[in-house]
């Protein structure tokens, strides 16, 4: 019972780290990448579809992304979605491809993105801690019900705390890496 609780907690903590990693990928750095567009959705045949499922991406230059839609009919919708996103770019459409040139990030904008990254990291840490709290409650309930002994309950809580520290540490490492990436000129 306790092993199941700990395994479930670990899976949820891994998922929280993965979501944080995906959130970081969507934050623009000095170099654009296809992941920059992963959170942008387009209405395509009545369904909201991520841009990265509607087109292929190439990065021919450090500050340019070329988007080649699989369906040319989706081009205006993709262009509009990118223009209205919070990327701060103006895509140009030549009929076959969409070119997106990213301006250099100003120091102010870099610091803004660092704040966004810190907020996303804190959200991730909070998710991990919430998972810990839920698992701890389940362990406490099992001890009170007499399903497990107090010693086993304490051992399980120590394991849970170690898991929590491990995954919070992973999020902190991701944040440190993202901050250095953002502040690199």
From Swiss-Prot:
The gene is frr. The lineage of its organism: Bacteria, Bacillati, Actinomycetota, Actinomycetes, Streptosporangiales. One of its GO terms (molecular function) is ribosomal large subunit binding. The keyword RNA-binding does not apply. GO terms for biological process: translational termination. Pfam families: RRF. It is found in: Cytoplasm. NCBIfam families: frr (TIGR00496). Belongs to the RRF family. Keywords: Cytoplasm, Protein biosynthesis. This is Ribosome-recycling factor. GO terms for cellular component: cytoplasm. Responsible for the release of ribosomes from messenger RNA at the termination of protein biosynthesis. May increase the efficiency of translation by recycling ribosomes from one round of translation to another.
């Amino acid at each position: 019972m306790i092993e199941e609780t700990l395994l479930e907690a670990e899976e949820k903590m891994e998922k929280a780290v993965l979501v944080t990693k995906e959130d970081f990928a969507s934050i623009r750095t000095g170099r654009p990448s296809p992941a920059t567009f992963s959170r942008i959705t387009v209405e395509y045949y009545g369904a909201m579809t991520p841009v990265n499922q509607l087109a292929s991406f190439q990065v021919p230059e450090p500050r340019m992304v070329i988007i080649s839609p699989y369906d040319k009919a989706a081009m205006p919708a993709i262009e509009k979605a990118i223009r209205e996103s919070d990327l701060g770019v103006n895509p140009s459409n030549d009929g076959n491809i969409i070119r997106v040139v990213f301006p250099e990030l100003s120091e102010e904008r870099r610091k803004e993105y660092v704040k966004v990254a810190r907020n996303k990291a804190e959200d991730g840490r909070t998710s991990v801690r919430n998972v810990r709290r839920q698992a701890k409650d389940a362990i406490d309930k099992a001890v009170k019900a007499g399903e497990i002994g107090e010693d086993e309950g304490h051992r399980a809580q120590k394991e849970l705390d170690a898991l929590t520290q491990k995954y919070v540490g992973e999020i902190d490492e991701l944040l440190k890496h993202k901050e250095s990436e953002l502040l690199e000129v």
